[in-house]
UniProtKB/Swiss-Prot annotation:
<dbReference type="InterPro" id="IPR026444">
    <property type="entry name" value="Secre_tail"/>
</dbReference>
<keyword id="KW-0326">Glycosidase</keyword>
<feature type="binding site">
    <location>
        <position position="234"/>
    </location>
    <ligand>
        <name>substrate</name>
    </ligand>
</feature>
<comment type="similarity">
    <text>Belongs to the glycosyl hydrolase 16 family.</text>
</comment>
<comment type="function">
    <text>Cleaves the sulfated polysaccharide porphyran at the (1-&gt;4) linkages between beta-D-galactopyranose and alpha-L-galactopyranose-6-sulfate, forming mostly the disaccharide alpha-L-galactopyranose-6-sulfate-(1-&gt;3)-beta-D-galactose. Some longer oligosaccharides of even number of residues are also observed. Inactive on the non-sulfated agarose portion of the porphyran backbone. Displays a strict requirement for C6-sulfate in the -2 and +1-binding subsites.</text>
</comment>
<keyword id="KW-0732">Signal</keyword>
<dbReference type="InterPro" id="IPR013320">
    <property type="entry name" value="ConA-like_dom_sf"/>
</dbReference>
<dbReference type="GO" id="GO:0004553">
    <property type="term" value="F:hydrolase activity, hydrolyzing O-glycosyl compounds"/>
</dbReference>
<feature type="binding site">
    <location>
        <position position="144"/>
    </location>
    <ligand>
        <name>substrate</name>
    </ligand>
</feature>
<feature type="binding site">
    <location>
        <position position="59"/>
    </location>
    <ligand>
        <name>substrate</name>
    </ligand>
</feature>
<dbReference type="InterPro" id="IPR000757">
    <property type="entry name" value="GH16"/>
</dbReference>
<feature type="binding site">
    <location>
        <position position="134"/>
    </location>
    <ligand>
        <name>substrate</name>
    </ligand>
</feature>
<protein>
    <recommendedName>
        <fullName>Beta-porphyranase A</fullName>
        <ecNumber>3.2.1.178</ecNumber>
    </recommendedName>
</protein>
<feature type="signal peptide">
    <location>
        <begin position="1"/>
        <end position="17"/>
    </location>
</feature>
<dbReference type="GO" id="GO:0042597">
    <property type="term" value="C:periplasmic space"/>
</dbReference>
<feature type="binding site">
    <location>
        <position position="139"/>
    </location>
    <ligand>
        <name>substrate</name>
    </ligand>
</feature>
<feature type="active site" description="Nucleophile">
    <location>
        <position position="139"/>
    </location>
</feature>
């Protein structure tokens, strides 16, 4: 998980990932971990990816260079670089002078899966692509995007174009490609957008933009073979393979790391399995604050520790820390937001022995629960990721809550009831108090809508992005002991603040 840097003035967690398509009856979406990656480490996960294309050298005048695909600052970076000056080769349209980038999955993609990736294109006259190939007869291009064509007459269309395509080879050689396109609201080089692809069947391909279906292709032949998932960059010296005549990349742009890099925030892949995704949660009190209490033993109320360390049944009465807000999870089921610190209740990955804690900054897989009403004011809560029920042992006083329950009986049941919402004055007071997180001290000035940040000395700048990935604020240079950020110009909505080293947090302005 990306490290949380600080709490901001308008502290509300937000989920910015795209909504999954509605599953077919009797099915639910399950994440395919081997094909999914948040790119949060310090290096590319070699269990999942090749950092080059082992099955193809690339498209002349570019070749893929091992290592030009790398992970840093929370992104998979695909950087295209200058191997030699184009003037030094005999034919700049055919001779190799550009080092391109590719990341190829080691696990094969399959029909039936849903694939989505959030990325920003490079500002080059090259493709920034998300596609599938390395089979016997087929290719599926989810997007081949031209961020900054050298042909000036294409600047008004190609940077806004979401182009999909299918190609046919081998036993189907001779069939013409079949594609379509969608005009995006902004340029791919300026914005992080989420591009989705549901390989619904061999005969139906659905394409999504920021969670909304925008295109559909019925391929010329059934596309039923497993393929590799690929992110890459390529030079297209001529109009070919469904890509327009865009012009060669400019050497000065290939030297500029602010322009030569396609940045992938994450890729997430899901498959349909039998079952329903927390659909029993339809009777959950969405939007209400509730308390949870052990049904036997010491009968204590569940408390969300403010430091986010754990949930523990230790409250004798319902106070601020014993209240949780029930919210709808975007993938089904619910989330619980702790009133103690504004964080989402989460498990710690698949480790069922670790405490449940109020530490989630967004509504992800760790924060997804099923609400199962047991009647008579009782409820059982199942974490969807682990498949286990939250448990408070009756035999322990001040019991720590863990996702260990194999069934929804006894220790796994809680008495619940609706509680009064925190008053506006209480909520305002909580927003305005001074925050100290990991040595970083943050305090707002509501009258002037500025935020003072201490403890970021030495960081190389910071930036604020809106929910579509557009940069809306920035502070450049090496940060000092005390920095101020004016947020008065921001409209209502969700935002991401990220420092130069990649530390970040989500916030919302109301």
């Amino acid at each position: 998980m990306k490290k949380v840097l600080l709490f901001l003035i308008f502290l509300v967690s937000a989920n910015l990932s795209a909504q999954l398509p509605s599953p077919t009856n009797g099915k639910k979406w399950e994440k395919v971990e081997q094909l999914s990656d948040e790119f949060n480490g310090n290096s590319i996960d070699t269990n999942k990816w090749y950092d080059y294309h082992p099955f193809w050298e690339g498209r002349a005048p570019s070749n893929f260079k091992k290592g030009n695909a790398f992970v840093s600052d929370g992104f998979l970076n695909l950087r295209s670089t200058l191997r030699k000056e184009p003037s030094s080769v005999q034919d700049p349209f055919k001779d190799i002078w550009v080092d391109a980038a590719a990341a190829v999955s080691k696990t094969k993609a399959q029909p039936g899966y849903y694939y989505e990736a959030r990325f920003k294109a490079s500002s080059l006259s090259m493709t920034s692509s998300f596609w599938f190939r390395v089979g016997q007869f087929s290719e599926i291009d989810v997007i081949e995007h031209i961020g900054n064509p050298s042909k000036e007459n294409r600047q008004d269309d190609l940077p806004y174009q979401y182009h999909v395509n299918t190609h046919y080879y081998g036993k189907h050689a001779g069939l013409q490609p079949l594609g379509t396109e969608y005009k995006m609201p902004g340029r791919g080089r300026d914005n992080f957008y989420t591009y989705g692809f549901w390989w619904k069947s061999p005969n139906e391909l659905l394409f999504y933009f920021n969670g909304k279906q925008v295109m559909r292709i019925v391929p010329r032949v059934p596309l039923d073979e497993e393929l590799r998932m690929i992110f890459d960059t390529e030079v297209f010296p001529f109009a070919t393979a469904g890509v327009a005549n865009i012009g060669l990349p400019k050497p000065e742009n290939l030297r500029d790391n602010s322009k030569n890099t396609m940045k992938v925030d994450w890729v997430r892949v899901y498959k349909l399995v039998d079952g329903t995704a927390a659909e029993d949660s339809s009777d959950a009190p969405i939007g209400s604050y509730i308390s949870l209490k052990k049904t036997q033993g010491d009968g204590k109320f569940v408390t969300g520790e403010k430091d986010g360390s754990q949930l523990v049944a230790r409250g004798s009465t319902v106070q601020s820390w014993e209240k949780f807000k029930v919210e709808k999870h975007p993938k089904g089921g619910i989330t619980l937001k702790a009133n103690s610190n504004g964080k989402y209740v989460q498990v710690q990955g698949s480790d069922i022995n670790k405490p449940v804690r109020a530490a989630g900054d967004f509504q992800g897989d760790w924060e997804q629960f099923e609400w199962k009403s047991k009647g008579n004011g009782l409820v059982a809560l199942k974490n969807v990721l682990t498949g286990k029920w939250l448990q408070a042992p009756w035999t322990e006083n001040n019991a720590i809550i863990r996702p260990k329950g194999p069934v929804d009986n006894g220790w796994e049941t809680f008495a619940w009831k609706k509680e009064t919402s925190p008053t506006a004055s209480t909520a305002l007071s909580a927003q305005l108090e001074t925050k100290t997180v990991d040595g970083i001290r943050v305090y707002p000035s509501p009258a002037s809508e500025t935020l003072t940040i201490e403890g970021v000395e030495g960081e190389n700048g910071l930036r604020v992005f809106d929910s579509t990935g557009n940069p809306v604020l920035k502070k450049e240079g090496i940060l000092g002991r005390k920095e101020r950020l004016n947020v008065s110009g921001l409209i209502k909505g969700n935002y991401l603040l990220r420092t130069g080293s990649g530390e970040q947090t989500w916030f919302q302005k109301n």
